[in-house]
Amino acid sequence: MEPGGDGAEDDVGAGIGPPAPGWCLRGRCRVGSQREDVGWWRSWLQQSYQAVKEKSSEALEFMKRDLTEFTQVVQRDTACTIAATASVVKEKLTTEGSSGATEKMKKGLSDFLGVISDTFAPSPDKTIDCDVITLMGTPSGTAEPYDGTKARLYSLQSDPATYCNEPDGPPELFDAWLSQFCLEEKKGEISELLVGSPSIRALYTKMVPAAVSHSEFWHRYFYKVHQLEQEQARRDALKQRAEQSISEEPGWEEEEEELAGVSPTSLKEAKVPVARPSTSPEGGPGPQSPCEENLVTPVEPPTEVTPSESSESVSLVTQIAKPPPASEAPALPKDLSQKLLEASLEEQDLAVDTGETGPPPRAQSKPHTPACRPSGPEPRPPARVETLREEILTDLRVFELNSDSGKSTPSNNGKKGSSTDISEDWEKDFDLDMTEEEVQMALSKVDASGELEDVEWEDWD
């Protein structure tokens, strides 16, 4: 049995022994490639699982966050709705009056709803309207309502340039401020800043004494604070000035009322009338009677002209725009006044010869006082025309001599030679040759007709 057994074992060992060289190499290559494929698939599966796990965890976190926010919103809205409903019901129950058991029941229900309202709805003093109040973080880690001045102060405290750089502005201002500043008086404030402001404490620990000294650190800080206070004071002053300018409305209406109160009549009354001297210029004929003096006085408006004035005198007075002072009026030459007298005499003689019955033309009306009667053989109208032209020669624009027959002379433009042209035109139109006797007769007829005319004018008045 043993030999047989040994033989069997030998056969098995012979069967298990190393195979041929070519077959053994191919088997090992196959096993190695299979192992590599299994390792790659395993790593790919692990990576895919890890990626899916990470994405799933992120999605789960987002879902949890959304659900949490949704739950909070629903709870808050529900609490607000319940509180509002309870408040409304409570108000209605308190306003409606009742008696007996109904009143007790309503009172208990009102108390219960009041407890619910106070539980779910916070009091108004504990709520913050985010649309109105803006919060800002302080260096100590707390939050407080936003203030521009405090925000700039916090920014200044946390800026390293505040302590490292030289102060802004002229050095003279810094020296003047430094001469009045005492660092010993700020010890308490420095201690509070180091305790209450982490940013200042960190910068102080980092810079002092490595970069700057203790005194330079605090001198620059307090000077920056001083400049900030000055800037804020200027802003407040500008703001106050702008508010005052907006609040003060312009008084345009008051100015218009004041201007409307000044009437044209008051302006006229304010004008000072120009006084005319009673004496006539040298070389010119002066007034011969009180009537002639009245002719050179300031003329009243046309509505107050008496009927005794002729159309010629009215047109002459109304055509004067600005009568100059008597001192500026040049003296009328004697030859010019003589020619005017001759022209008026020729016109009167023509009216007498043609048999006209109307009143002779006159330059000015005759006053009705006895002192105004003509004292000589010469007619009064030429003398009055001569006196009036002497006073208003410079401002006269149009001077017309109108006859009763309807004929008029060319216009006078205010020049001295114009009256000479008038007399020459009259001589050319009529071409009259009169002797001295005819002139005397014409003058006597003119005096007679003048007296009749005065009577007629008095009757007409």
Swiss-Prot record:
Transmembrane segments annotated in the record for this chain: none
SUPFAM superfamilies (alphabetical): BSD domain-like (SSF140383)
Keyword Phosphoprotein: yes
Location of Phosphothreonine modifications: T387
Domain BSD: 177-229
Phosphoserine sites (modified residues): S123, S197, S418, S419, S449
Name of this chain's protein: BSD domain-containing protein 1
Originating gene: BSDC1
Protein keywords: Phosphoprotein
